[in-house]
Amino acid sequence: MDELCLKEIFEDFNEKFSGKKCRVETNYSKLNNFIVSFDVLDLHHLLGLHKVIPLKATDSIESIKQERLTLESFKNHSQYSDIKPRIENYEFIEEVFKASSIEVCILEKDIKQKSSMNLAVVFFKKDRNKYIVLGLKRNIRTNTFHLATLHETRSKQYESYKKTKFEITEWI
């Protein structure tokens, strides 16, 4: 996606991920596999739309679908610079779950600095002088994992954490 377009991102996510689940296997015996569930509503937070528009996820996704919400809608917002990297790094989701170009993750047991996000799994990659981070939360009720955050950081904290090998073994 050379030019950023919310509708293209929505359509891509809808086609490749939304409504689907995948099984992830790890080399950690206490969590040797888990299910990741994908929902198009996750895009609202992944792309940081909650920072620049007062809409709920269902309304923002519907507005994107109808092309009433575009990047132009909030390009002048004071927090646009916070969400632009999220949109630019959207394809990292595919790198993790489809292209299998990321081979290690960090599990909750190894996350030393707990944040308010309460992430259960973190995928990351170094990109020049920054890290692209995709975090998952665990839904205790369904015992599945969901995409929760996609952002950039300059912090090198993830480099020092113990890493766990993983593999996407099947799409359900």
Question: Can you say where each PLM-predicted feature lies in the sequence?
Answer:
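An acidic, glycine-rich, mixed-charge low-complexity segment common to nucleic-acid enzymes
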Residues: 1-124
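Conserved binding-pocket/active-site segment within a compact domain
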Residues: 91-172
